[in-house]
């Protein structure tokens, strides 16, 4: 995993004109996915849902409906809009309708789309509601941040883990880069963050000097494309640099994000920021 991801980061930097700035040993990976596996020694295991009807938690069901709504807004030509489902409590029937609609979205990765989405929903729910999982995932991130770390990159749920890690256990790194992030998703993610947002604003991560947020225009996971209004420090002292990309048909794909020139530019800017002191 390290080799492929390191190569993708370096590719993005080189596309942005940073040839020779990074080598594979400069890139480290924080992995916490084992905590979600059934039989994990870290926490009590949990079955992965095999079908949409296995989503038995209200948070999972509501996340699915919110993704459906976001997909209908982003791709009205492909995804039919919900007709009042969002105003009622989720049911197995509406969850199935949401899944059927989402499978038409560009955000879903081909033949494994349903399995991917079901697993993602369960992981998000478990992270947000299980304190042991939350603590383990954040420790997996903070223990990999060294004194010479200049940028932290978080993708999808990993962006939530990275953000919370840097807030709860501040580290002096140059920059945070979030990719395909659900951080701005109201109520279900944003309002459940730690530290808890207040007055519609969340805390700026301590020790971070710059923050770039990138997502594809069709990415339903990153349903809120602009994080600035939610995380900027009043007065312009710190602002999120929000950018919308076009990842082609791999809308939410980590590799496509990392190799994008815009991500490379954000990494280069972080390296320069740290070098300039």
Predicted regions and their residues:
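N-terminal accessory alpha/beta regions
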Residues: 24-79
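Lipid deacylating catalytic domains
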Residues: 1-44, 81-153, 157-277
């Amino acid at each position: 995993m390290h080799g492929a991801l390191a190569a993708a980061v370096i590719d993005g930097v080189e596309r942005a004109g940073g040839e020779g700035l990074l080598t594979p040993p400069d890139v480290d990976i924080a992995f916490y996915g084992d905590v979600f596996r059934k039989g994990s020694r870290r926490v009590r295991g949990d079955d992965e849902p095999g079908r949409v009807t296995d989503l038995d938690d209200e948070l999972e069901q509501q996340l699915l409906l919110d993704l459906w709504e976001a997909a209908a807004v982003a791709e009205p030509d492909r995804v039919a809009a919900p007709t009042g489902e969002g105003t009622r409590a989720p049911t197995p029937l509406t969850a199935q309708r949401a899944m059927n609609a989402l499978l038409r979205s560009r955000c879903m990765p081909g033949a494994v789309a349903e399995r991917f989405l079901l697993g993602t929903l369960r992981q998000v729910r478990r992270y947000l509601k299980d304190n042991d999982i939350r603590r383990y995932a954040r420790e997996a991130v903070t223990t990999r941040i060294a004194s010479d770390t200049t940028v932290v990159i978080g993708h999808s749920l990993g962006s939530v883990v990275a953000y919370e890690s840097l807030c709860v256990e501040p580290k002096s790194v140059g920059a945070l880069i979030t990719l395909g992030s659900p951080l701005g998703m109201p109520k279900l993610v944003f309002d459940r963050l730690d530290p808890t947002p207040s007055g519609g604003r969340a805390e700026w991560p301590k020790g971070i000097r710059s923050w770039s947020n990138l997502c594809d225009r069709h990415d339903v996971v990153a349903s809120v494309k602009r994080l600035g209004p939610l995380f900027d420090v009043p007065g312009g002292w710190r602002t999120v640099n929000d950018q919308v990309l076009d990842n082609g048909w791999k809308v939410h794909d980590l590799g496509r994000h990392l190799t994008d020139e815009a991500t490379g530019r954000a990494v280069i800017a972080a390296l320069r920021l740290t070098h300039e002191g």
